[in-house]
Design a protein with these regions (language model features):
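N-terminal, polar/charged subdomain of small-to-medium soluble alpha/beta proteins
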Residues: 2-4, 8-107, 113-154
Length: 154
């Protein structure tokens, strides 16, 4: 990604029309979108997940993500390639944060470029569901009343 300023991207890989990043310090949603190949596309569908500031009526200070760092980029890339094949989309760019993510900050970003919107929306929804089910990530929610590990792989 030319001209892209990032705060320490830990792992980055591109395979065909799939671009994956694992970001430690920040996630630049718009710069990630620039990794898409828009050839022949009339649609870009985007999902951005952010740390909520309140959960179950209690203030959330931050999330802390732990990852199997050697495996995470490959899992994300495999999901992107599956989405391209299964839904007929042209290009996928996805990124996930690790470490500390404060309330309001992006955790995950998924961009899907496709000829038409229907397959883009379907692929994007499938990607976030599969990422949550398959990615080797664990999440600790730190709230004003304590901390709790949330469901994750493993």
């Amino acid at each position: 990604m030319q001209g892209c300023q990032r705060s320490r991207v830990e792992n980055m890989s591109s395979s065909g029309n799939v671009h994956v990043e694992v970001a430690v310090d920040s996630l630049d949603v718009e710069a990630l979108r620039g990794a898409l190949d828009l050839t022949g596309c009339g649609s870009v569908v985007t999902f951005v997940g952010v740390t909520r500031d309140v959960a179950d009526g209690v203030e959330v200070k931050r999330l802390e993500f732990d990852a199997w760092e050697e495996q995470l980029p490959g899992v994300l890339a495999d999901l992107g390639e599956q989405a391209c094949a299964q839904f007929g989309v042209h290009s996928v760019a996805l990124a996930h944060r690790t470490g500390v993510v404060l309330a309001g900050e992006p955790i995950v970003a998924i961009h899907v470029a496709s000829p038409h919107r229907a397959e883009g929306f379907a692929a994007c929804a499938w990607l976030i569901d599969e990422l949550k089910a398959q990615a080797p990530l664990w999440k600790r929610e730190v709230r004003v009343d304590g901390a709790v590990w949330k469901a994750g792989l493993g």
